[in-house]
């Protein structure tokens, strides 16, 4: 199966992607950093990244988005690397983002995407504690093949991917990467 997701709730997603997806009747989920609405991202990006000029959608736009074809999920409050911050701060980022978005949209927020895909077992437990149904990483697995009902993987697709690259990603050609990373980590011990 395929899930269309967008991290960071950039204004360009609302302006460009959503009209095209809606015209085609395709559902998508936007993961929102709840306390950065209407601002430029405060996180570090690669030099020359097209995202460096982006603006996060303002609150009014986020509030108007939920529909049968557009769902919202949490992307924490301020987009930190959750495994690298104090557990109390991580708990606040995870829980407050959900409550902030629920208050703004009057929708039940049940999904979270980890900023940078960064998580550990404590972060996963904090997400369960906060009441999320499913959380997403950037591990390059299909959405239904990570082996966990709670933590799901995703494969990043970029606008500049060739048709071949898209085909390979769609068909799981990069599913070996987590295994290689695991082995590499074990060999360092």
Question: What are these model-derived regions, one by one?
Answer:
Residues 1-5, 11-16, 84-189:
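C-terminal active-site subregion of NodB/CE4 polysaccharide deacetylases
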Residues 1-2, 11, 22-120, 149-152:
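Metal-dependent polysaccharide deacetylase catalytic core of the NodB/CE4 family, i.e.
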């Amino acid at each position: 199966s395929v899930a269309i997701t967008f991290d960071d709730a950039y204004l360009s997603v609302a302006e460009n992607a959503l009209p095209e997806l809606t015209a085609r009747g395709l559902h998508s989920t936007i993961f929102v950093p709840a306390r950065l609405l209407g601002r430029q991202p405060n996180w570090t990006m690669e030099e020359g990244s097209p995202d460096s000029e982006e603006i996060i959608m303002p609150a009014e736009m986020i509030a108007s988005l939920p529909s049968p074809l557009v769902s919202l999920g949490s992307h924490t409050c301020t987009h930190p690397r959750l495994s690298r911050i104090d557990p109390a701060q991580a708990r606040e980022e995870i829980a407050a983002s959900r409550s902030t978005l629920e208050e703004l949209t009057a929708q039940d927020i049940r999904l979270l995407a980890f900023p940078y895909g960064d998580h550990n077992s404590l972060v996963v437990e904090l997400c369960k504690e906060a009441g999320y149904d499913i959380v997403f990483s950037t591990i390059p697995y299909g959405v239904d093949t990570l082996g966990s009902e709670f933590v799901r993987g995703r494969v990043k697709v970029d606008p500049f991917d060739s048709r071949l690259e898209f085909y390979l990603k769609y068909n799981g050609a990069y599913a070996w990467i987590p295994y290689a990373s695991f082995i590499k980590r074990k060999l360092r011990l």
